[in-house]
C-alpha cells in the first residue's frame, strides 16, 4: 500500500492509503497513544471494499511519526486536529469522511467545529462529548464518587488498565504481554477475548514502531475546554455517534449524550462491543459507518 511521510511544523507524520484513490476518501483517526496499526487491517479492508479510499496515519509520538520530549515540546488537541488536516492535504483530499475513536472522537468533534469544509461526514465512537470533563470523571471514578457530568464514569476495568500501564515491564516479551492484557481489559466482557488475535496485532504494531515500548504522552494532553461543548449545536456535518454497549471508558449513554447536542446526529449501538476492535465487531461496525457515508452522498 502507498505510504507518505508528511512534514508539518517540524513534525513528521507517517500515513498510508488503502484502496482505490478514485473512491470516496475516508480518514481514520486513532485513539490516544496508538498508531495507525490500531485500525486492524481486516477492518480497513472492509471499508476499502465498500468503496472508500482509506487513509490512516500515526499520531505524533506514535508509530513512525516524530517523537519528542513532551516537556520541551508540549502540544494539545488543536495541534492534533491540524495534524489530521495536514494528512488530508498530503493526500490531496479536499474533504473526507472522518472516523475517530477515543482520542480521535475528540479530534473529530473539533474538526467538525473548526474545519467543517474538510468533512463529508463524521463518525465518532469510544469517547464522550466536548462538554464532558473526562479527567474529572476519571478522578471521580478513582474515588468511587459519581461523575461531575451525571453520566456513567469509567468502569473498574478501565481503571485497572490505567494502573497496568504504570507497572514496570522489562523484556520485550513482558512488554508484549502487558500490551495484550491492556486490550483484554479494554475489550470488556461482551465479546470473548482472543489473546492470540491481539498478540498478533501488537507484534505488528511493535514492528511498525520499532519498539515494544508504548507511548504515554497523550495522557498528558489537557482536554479541550468543556465550554466548547456548547458549540456542538452549530455542527452541520452529518454525524454518527456509535455506542459500544460494553465500553469500559465511555459506557452508555455517552453516545446519546453527544448526539443530542448535534442537530440531526444519529446513534447506532453495537452490542457487546467494548473499547477495542476485535474481529467479532468488524462487520456491524463497518456496516454502520458505510451506511452513514452512503446516506450523505445520495
Curated annotation (Swiss-Prot):
- What's a Pfam family this protein contains? Abhydrolase_1
Q: Which residues form the AB hydrolase-1 domain?
A: 25-277
Molecular function, one GO term: intramolecular lyase activity
Key word DNA-binding present: no
Which Cys-Cys disulphide bridges does the record give? Answer: none
Question: Which reaction does this chain catalyze?
Answer: rhodomycin D + H2O = 10-carboxy-13-deoxycarminomycin + methanol + H(+); 4-O-methylrhodomycin D + H2O = 10-carboxy-13-deoxydaunorubicin + methanol + H(+)
Per UniProt, the keywords (alphabetical) are: Antibiotic biosynthesis, Hydrolase
The Enzyme Commission number assigned here is 3.1.1.-
- Single Gene Ontology BP term? glycerolipid catabolic process
UniProt pathway = Antibiotic biosynthesis; daunorubicin biosynthesis; Antibiotic biosynthesis; carminomycin biosynthesis
Q: Which family is annotated?
A: Belongs to the methyl esterase DnrP family.
The task this protein performs is described as:
Involved in the biosynthesis of the anthracyclines carminomycin and daunorubicin (daunomycin) which are aromatic polyketide antibiotics that exhibit high cytotoxicity and are widely applied in the chemotherapy of a variety of cancers. Catalyzes the removal of methyl group from the carbomethoxy group of rhodomycin D (10-carbomethoxy-13-deoxycarminomycin) and 4-O-methylrhodomycin D to yield 10-carboxy-13-deoxycarminomycin and 10-carboxy-13-deoxydaunorubicin, respectively.
Q: What is this protein called?
A: Rhodomycin D methylesterase DauP
- Native organism is Streptomyces sp. (strain C5)
Q: What is the lineage of its organism?
A: Bacteria, Bacillati, Actinomycetota, Actinomycetes, Kitasatosporales
Amino acid at each position: 500500500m502507498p505510504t507518505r511521510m508528511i512534514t508539518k511544523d517540524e513534525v513528521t507524520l507517517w500515513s498510508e492509503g488503502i484502496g482505490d484513490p478514485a473512491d470516496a476518501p475516508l480518514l481514520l483517526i486513532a485513539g490516544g497513544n496508538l498508531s495507525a496499526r490500531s485500525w486492524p487491517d481486516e477492518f480497513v479492508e472492509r471499508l476499502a471494499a465498500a468503496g472508500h479510499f482509506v487513509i490512516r496515519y500515526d499520531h505524533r509520538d506514535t508509530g513512525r511519526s516524530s517523537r519528542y520530549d513532551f516537556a520541551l515540546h508540549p502540544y494539545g488537541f488543536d495541534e492534533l486536529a491540524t495534524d489530521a488536516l495536514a494528512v488530508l492535504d498530503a493526500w490531496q483530499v479536499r474533504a473526507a469522511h472522518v472516523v475517530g475513536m477515543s482520542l480521535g472522537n475528540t479530534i473529530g468533534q473539533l474538526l467538525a467545529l473548526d474545519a467543517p469544509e474538510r468533512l463529508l461526514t463524521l463518525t465518532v465512537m469510544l469517547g464522550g462529548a466536548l462538554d464532558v470533563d473526562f479527567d474529572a470523571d476519571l478522578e471521580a471514578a478513582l474515588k468511587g464518587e459519581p461523575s461531575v457530568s451525571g453520566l456513567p464514569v469509567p468502569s473498574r476495568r478501565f481503571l485497572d488498565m490505567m494502573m497496568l500501564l504504570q507497572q514496570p515491564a522489562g523484556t520485550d516479551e513482558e512488554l508484549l504481554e502487558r500490551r495484550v492484557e491492556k486490550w483484554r481489559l479494554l475489550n470488556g466482557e461482551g465479546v470473548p477475548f482472543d489473546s492470540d488475535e491481539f498478540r498478533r496485532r501488537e507484534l505488528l504494531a511493535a514492528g511498525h514502531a520499532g519498539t515494544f515500548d508504548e507511548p504515554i504522552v497523550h495522557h498528558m494532553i489537557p482536554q479541550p475546554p468543556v465550554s466548547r461543548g456548547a458549540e456542538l449545536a452549530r455542527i452541520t456535518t452529518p454525524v454518527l455517534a456509535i455506542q459500544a454497549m460494553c465500553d469500559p471508558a465511555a459506557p452508555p449513554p455517552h453516545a446519546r449524550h453527544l448526539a443530542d447536542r448535534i442537530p440531526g446526529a444519529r446513534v447506532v449501538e453495537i452490542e457487546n462491543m467494548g473499547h477495542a476492535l476485535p474481529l467479532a465487531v468488524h462487520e456491524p461496525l463497518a456496516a454502520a459507518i458505510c451506511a452513514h457515508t452512503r446516506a450523505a452522498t445520495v
